[in-house]
UniProtKB/Swiss-Prot annotation:
The keyword Cytoplasm applies. InterPro entries: Ferritin (IPR001519), Ferritin-like (IPR012347), Ferritin-like_diiron (IPR009040), Ferritin-like_SF (IPR009078), Ferritin_CS (IPR014034), Ferritin_DPS_dom (IPR008331). Residues 7-156 form the Ferritin-like diiron domain. One of its GO terms (cellular component) is autolysosome. Residues 54-61 are annotated as: Catalytic site for iron oxidation. One of its GO terms (molecular function) is iron ion binding. This is Ferritin light chain. Oligomer of 24 subunits. There are two types of subunits: L (light) chain and H (heavy) chain. The major chain can be light or heavy, depending on the species and tissue type. The functional molecule forms a roughly spherical shell with a diameter of 12 nm and contains a central cavity into which the insoluble mineral iron core is deposited. Interacts with NCOA4. Its main location: cytoplasm. The lineage of its organism: Eukaryota, Metazoa, Chordata, Craniata, Vertebrata.
Length: 175
């Protein structure tokens, strides 16, 4: 059944939004896995755990925002299977941060591709929506992760476990 409110919302854009929702669901699931890995008693890095669980929440808010926009534009949300994260054992903080940065770069590219598709279909509402709610935040997050990786590498060395602990305590402390 077609929507009575749909206007200037292409089926290509609708499909790309559904694909992006799936990517955000996958990212949230991955960050949840990361967060609870670092919360384990044999890993015990509370600040790192908190950082990744906050990202899981942000991605949840992102996919809900995308789904709401999809409905407001007269599109239909089509849910797909969510794969389990590639890892169960995430290793040390730098390894996890590298995996997270790769995930964010993939999300950012999908957002840029959707923006380009919206521009090609002359959909200013979609472009404004992405610029307002997603694109700037992605760039800031990638920068933050890059900074964290730089600091983790600085703290590495023969006592890498101590460096990881200090990074967690001094950089990722939370209230």
């Amino acid at each position: 059944m077609s929507s009575q409110i749909r206007q200037n919302y292409s089926t290509d854009v609708e499909a790309a939004v559904n694909s992006l929702v799936n990517m955000y669901l996958q990212a949230s699931y991955t960050y949840l896995s990361l967060g609870f890995y670092f919360d384990r008693d044999d890993v015990a890095l509370e600040g790192v755990s908190h950082f990744f669980r906050e990202l899981a929440e942000e991605k949840r808010e992102g996919y809900e925002r995308l789904l709401k926009m999809q409905n407001q534009r007269g599109g239909r949300a089509l849910f797909q299977d969510i794969k389990k994260p590639a890892e169960d054992e995430w290793g040390k903080t730098p390894d996890a941060m590298k995996a997270a940065m790769a995930l964010e770069k993939k999300l950012n590219q999908a957002l840029l591709d959707l923006h380009a598709l919206g521009s090609a279909h002359t959909d200013p509402h979609l472009c404004d929506f992405l610029e307002t709610h997603f694109l700037d935040e992605e760039v800031k997050l990638i920068k933050k992760m890059g900074d964290h990786l730089t600091n983790l590498h600085r703290l590495g060395g023969p006592e890498a476990g101590l460096g990881e602990y200090l990074f967690e305590r001094l950089t990722l402390k939370h209230d």
